[in-house]
Amino acid sequence: MADDFAYLNARVRVRRGTLLKESFFQEALDLSFADFLRLLSETVYGGELAGQGLPDVDRAVLRTQAKLVGDLPRLVTGEAREAVRLLLLRNDLHNLQALLRAKATGRPFEEVLLLPGTLREEVWRQAYEAQDPAGMAQVLAVPGHPLARALRAVLRETQDLARVEALLAKRFFEDVAKAAKGLDQPALRDYLALEVDAENLRTAFKLQGSGLAPDAFFLKGGRFVDRVRFARLMEGDYAVLDELSGTPFSGLSGVRDLKALERGLRCVLLKEAKKGVQDPLGVGLVLAYVKEREWEAVRLRLLARRAYFGLPRAQVEEEVVCP
């Protein structure tokens, strides 16, 4: 193993060559489920596709992503490993928040979109099967995951799901920001600052009309969303989004619901992450690759469901295309 990015980036360049082309997704928008399975079997996901059902597609996507992304920290040591680990920890936060929502709504584990992070699928399944969020924290504590401590602390403050998610993000990003400052990786720091902005926008939408104090949920460390804008958006002042013209978030002007916001944020973060290909000697190339793989997983699951349930193209097209 190497302690810099030269070796890792060489491996990542090869793996980027297995990313699915845009033509795959355009073709898949019109396919039956059987034809979608055939097309998927001819890709890098085919080796893990062991059945003919929707759960088999999800399993193939999850396991392929784990192989092609989850092992990246193990390919390097030192600062390079820590930088990659911070990227994948962000996915662990996503996974924990997704499992908390699934538990609260009775959604089965198989329907949860897990992103490749630092933990195996089996650990997330055990967390899902825990009796309550406190039990989930206990499961995460076994491998010594930092989110276990964060979840325990948050649960001492509130049991409300929206507040739990927001406070988890606050603790997570505060810890990650501290760790990132110690690394000589400007591409990582700049990207994480955008993630903080995105999380603040997301949280403000979720907590609109709650009457809660903004200071308890506002994340420091962003570039474009300050505390004043955060508080205004929590109060329903959508002019905040118009004020972001000239920033990476300019495309959010006019957004009024959480679903549209999530879709817009996903595309903004993907676009900014892909600029990392211009950072061949640092973590930027890995950042671009990780986010491209994530987007690929999201699109595959959505297209599989469109084909399986026979949904019209127009119903999912805007969900699987980033301008």
UniProtKB/Swiss-Prot annotation:
Keyword flag Glycoprotein: no
Superkingdom in the source lineage: Bacteria
GO cellular component, one term: proton-transporting V-type ATPase, V0 domain
Gene Ontology terms, MF aspect: ATP binding; proton-transporting ATP synthase activity, rotational mechanism; proton-transporting ATPase activity, rotational mechanism
Gene3D superfamilies, A to Z: ATP synthase (C/AC39) subunit, domain 3, V-type ATP synthase subunit C domain
Coiled coil: none
GO biological process terms, semicolon-separated: proton motive force-driven plasma membrane ATP synthesis
Cited Pfam families: vATP-synt_AC39 (PF01992)
InterPro entries: ATPase_csu/dsu_sf, ATPase_V0-cplx_csu, ATPase_V0-cplx_csu/dsu, V-ATPase_V0D/AC39_subunit, V-type_ATPase_csu/dsu, V-type_ATPase_csu/dsu_dom_3
UniProtKB keywords: ATP synthesis, Hydrogen ion transport, Ion transport, Transport
Task performed by this protein: Produces ATP from ADP in the presence of a proton gradient across the membrane.
Family: Belongs to the V-ATPase V0D/AC39 subunit family.
Protein name: V-type ATP synthase subunit C
Source species taxonomy: Bacteria, Thermotogati, Deinococcota, Deinococci, Thermales
